């Protein structure tokens, strides 16, 4: 009997260890209304970005009659929809990337150390929760926070590390990173 309890305790400890602590950022809150026979019913919609600041990020939206409940729902949805993004040196993107959603377009560029996060509004929240320290990003078209975050996530999903590229092509990482001889001769 005691052995079974010890096993259960170890399993509980392991599940607690595997659940990393997530940081969250509230991006937008909107007051929404529904017109009914007796008048208008007001509610709130929240947009939240959640990440572990080590390469995982997700976003969610929640709607409820009260603000805290909407934020809680959005946070839960964001935790369920997290994606993993390969980061170079744990601080920036591997390559320049473009993301689109609806009328929104986002261009993200890898940056040298010390650049910081040069991005506006909702994109900044995504990069901070992801753990990116150096990036230059520009949003074009739709300035709607939902579209901007979805376009940013679209671009991040396309991000791939040299290891992933090498695996797809059936080559070694050194072959992917190697410069062509023409460039080496000029340099």
Curated annotation (Swiss-Prot):
Single biological process term from Gene Ontology: translation
Keywords: Ribonucleoprotein, Ribosomal protein, RNA-binding, rRNA-binding
InterPro entries referenced in this protein's UniProt entry, alphabetically: Ribosomal_Su5_D2-typ_SF, Ribosomal_uS5, Ribosomal_uS5_bac-type, Ribosomal_uS5_C, Ribosomal_uS5_N, Ribosomal_uS5_N_CS, Ribsml_uS5_D2-typ_fold_subgr
Pfam family, one: Ribosomal_S5_C
Region span, Disordered: 1-20, 154-174
Span of domain S5 DRBM: 22-85
Record-level Gene Ontology MF annotations: rRNA binding; structural constituent of ribosome
Gene Ontology CC entries for this record: small ribosomal subunit
Family according to the record: Belongs to the universal ribosomal protein uS5 family.
Annotated PANTHER family: MITOCHONDRIAL RIBOSOMAL PROTEIN S5
Domains: entry comment: The N-terminal domain interacts with the head of the 30S subunit; the C-terminal domain interacts with the body and contacts protein S4. The interaction surface between S4 and S5 is involved in control of translational fidelity.
Job of this protein: With S4 and S12 plays an important role in translational accuracy.
Assembly behavior: Part of the 30S ribosomal subunit. Contacts proteins S4 and S8.
Name of the featured protein: Small ribosomal subunit protein uS5
Source organism (scientific name): Cereibacter sphaeroides (strain ATCC 17025 / ATH 2.4.3) (Rhodobacter sphaeroides)
Primary gene name: rpsE
């Amino acid at each position: 009997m005691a052995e079974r309890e010890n096993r259960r305790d170890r399993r509980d400890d392991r599940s607690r260890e595997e659940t990393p602590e997530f940081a969250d950022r509230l991006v937008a809150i909107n007051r929404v209304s529904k017109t009914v026979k007796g008048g208008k019913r007001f509610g709130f919609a929240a947009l939240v970005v959640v990440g572990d600041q080590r390469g995982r990020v997700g976003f969610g939206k929640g709607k409820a009659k009260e603000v805290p409940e909407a934020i809680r729902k959005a946070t839960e949805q964001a935790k369920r929809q997290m994606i993993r993004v390969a980061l170079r040196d744990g601080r920036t993107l591997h390559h320049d990337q473009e993301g689109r959603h609806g009328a929104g377009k986002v261009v993200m560029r890898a940056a040298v150390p010390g650049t910081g996060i040069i991005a506006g509004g909702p994109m900044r929240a995504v990069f901070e929760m992801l753990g990116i320290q150096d990036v230059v990003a520009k949003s074009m078209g739709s300035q709607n926070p939902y579209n901007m975050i979805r376009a940013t996530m679209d671009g991040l999903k396309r991000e791939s590390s040299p290891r992933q590229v090498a695996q797809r092509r059936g080559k070694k990482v050194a072959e992917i990173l190697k410069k062509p001889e023409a460039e080496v001769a000029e340099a």
